[in-house]
Amino acid sequence: GASSVGKVVKYTVFLPVILLVIMAIKGCTMSGAGEGLRMFFIPSTSAFEDPSLWIDAIGQVFYSLSIMMAIMFAYGSYLGESANVAKDCVIIALSDAAVIILSVIVMFSTMGGVGMLDSITDSGIATAFIVYPQAIVNLTDIGWFNALFGAIFYLMLVTLAIDSAFSIIEGVSASVADKFHFNPKKVTRWACVISAVISLLYATRAGVAWLDIVDNWTNQINLIVIGILECIAVGWCFQIDKVWQQINRNTKKFKMPRIWIRLAIRYIAPATLL
């Protein structure tokens, strides 16, 4: 339930941010960090002509904000009557963008500091478990410091994984428990067991290949298709004015214009995803 999740995520959400700040400070103080940061903040304009770049970016935003995922419906059901949806959405989006920028600063500054910017374009899996560990080894000549920095990095990954697991499992368990009136704890337990068994596939020799396939499917094709279908369902099949009323129900100064809601959900969002 919401109370159990809240007790854990308040640590798993803020701890990675603290660790990222520590890593960013270290990365930005390295001699070659400027080259990496320059590569990030002044990108090649030709890269924006690649359609796959935009698909990857949309998939990243969808996954990072959990847009179109079951967890949004589950967490939404936990909101009280006084919740300011419009304000919360703005805060969440800006916070997410800030953390993403901080993460990229850590990556580019560290990779620039150890002279490994040529490997920055590797896949996310390779970057996290092959390229970045190599960069950590070359941080300094002090072995224990490199080991400490590596421990901080992987502690951050573990806390992020736990936080993601909570969101994924809660979205499934809350929906099933509410729909069929099952015991929420039992549903959560079975969801964890089934997910753990399925995840054993990634521990096989073909695990990396399967992980790439699932990652590309869920973060790109699947989320985009579901996004278009949900825009059609909400914009054309559901009374969109009710959505507008719910968004602005508890707002005082910042109110979402009705015309913008209609245009965004019915036309702009589907066209952008296509």
Placement of each model-derived feature along the sequence:
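Alpha-helical transmembrane segments and their membrane-interface junctions
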Residues: L200-R205, A271-L273
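Hydrophobic transmembrane alpha-helical segments of multi-pass transport and channel proteins
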Residues: A97-L102, A161-S164, L200, Q220-I228, ...
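Hydrophobic, well-ordered secondary-structure elements that form the walls
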Residues: D163, V214, L274
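Membrane-embedded translocation segments of transport machinery
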Residues: G6-S167, S173-W190, I194-I198
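Flexible glycine/proline-rich, aromatic-decorated loop/lid segments
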Residues: M107, T121-V131, T188-C192, A203-T204, ...
